[in-house]
Swiss-Prot record:
Pfam families: V-set
GO MF assignments: MHC protein binding; peptide antigen binding
Top-rank lineage group of the source organism: Eukaryota
Cysteines paired by S-S bonds: 41-113
Provenance organism: Homo sapiens
Protein name: T cell receptor gamma variable 3
Gene3D superfamilies per record: Immunoglobulins
Compartmental location: Cell membrane
Length: 118
């Protein structure tokens, strides 16, 4: 079965947050169930300590999936999420990738990355 995983990288902007303009960098991804997908978050801000990843599904409030602690290079999952489902890696400075494993239909939605203190 094929399904669409819509990816939107956006930065939220309350006063305590660092943000960046994505200039229309919306990406739609379609993958087979059981496969994996990667979502890239490029930032131009310095002194970033935490990268937060959110999933927004239609009719629901956005849900934080995890945050990545830059200083320890460690993901901190929200409670109730399966270890190994999501993880973050950084292929180069100021770029982070969220990898989603073992995709299911319920993984479809809009994904956001943001940065601010934990």
């Amino acid at each position: 079965m094929r399904w669409a995983l819509l990816v939107l990288l956006a930065f939220l902007s309350p006063a305590s947050q660092k943000s960046s303009n994505l200039e229309g960098r919306t990406k739609s991804v379609t993958r087979q169930t059981g496969s994996s997908a990667e979502i890239t978050c490029d930032l131009t801000v310095t002194n970033t300590f935490y990268i937060h990843w959110y999933l927004h599904q239609e009719g629901k409030a956005p849900q934080r999936l995890l945050y990545y602690d830059v200083s320890t290079a460690r993901d901190v999952l929200e409670s109730g999420l399966s270890p190994g489902k999501y993880y973050t890696h950084t292929p180069r400075r100021w770029s982070w990738i969220l990898r989603l494993q073992n995709l299911i239909e319920n993984d479809s939605g809009v994904y956001y990355c943001a940065t601010w203190d934990r």
